[in-house]
C-alpha cells in the first residue's frame, strides 16, 4: 500500500485500460486522480527535450556574416535560456 502512494502512476485497478488518440493509436490510460497533471508534466518535459534539435539550425547563422541575423540569433538564444531555466525550476 505504501508503494502505491510513493509512485502515483501505479494503477490501483491492477490493469491498464487504453484510449484511442487523435491519430487512432492505442495509448495507455492512467487511472489515477493526478493522471491529467502527470501527463501534462510529461508532455511539457517532452517538449523541452524536442526543442534543442531546433537550436542546431540557429548555430549556423553566424556563418552568414549578416549582423542583423547574428543579433537576432543572440536575442533568441538569450530568451530560450531564460525560458528553459524558468521552466526547469518551476
From Swiss-Prot:
Major place of residence: host cell
Region (Disordered): 1-32
GO term, biological process aspect, one: symbiont-mediated suppression of host cytoplasmic pattern recognition receptor signaling pathway via inhibition of MAVS activity
Compartment(s) of residence: Host mitochondrion inner membrane; Host nucleus; Host cytoplasm, Host cytosol
A GO CC term assigned to this protein in UniProt: membrane
Regions of compositional bias (Polar residues) in chain numbering: 14-28
Top-level taxon: Viruses
Site positions for Low pathogenicity: 66
Main function: Plays an important role in promoting lung pathology in both primary viral infection and secondary bacterial infection. Promotes alteration of mitochondrial morphology, dissipation of mitochondrial membrane potential, and cell death. Alternatively, inhibits the production of interferon in the infected cell at the level of host mitochondrial antiviral signaling MAVS. Its level of expression differs greatly depending on which cell type is infected, in a manner that is independent of the levels of expression of other viral proteins. Monocytic cells are more affected than epithelial cells.
Summary of subunit composition and partner proteins: Oligomer. Interacts with human SLC25A6/ANT3 and VDAC1. Interacts with host MAVS.
Family: Belongs to the influenza viruses PB1-F2 family.
Protein name (record): Protein PB1-F2
Gene: PB1
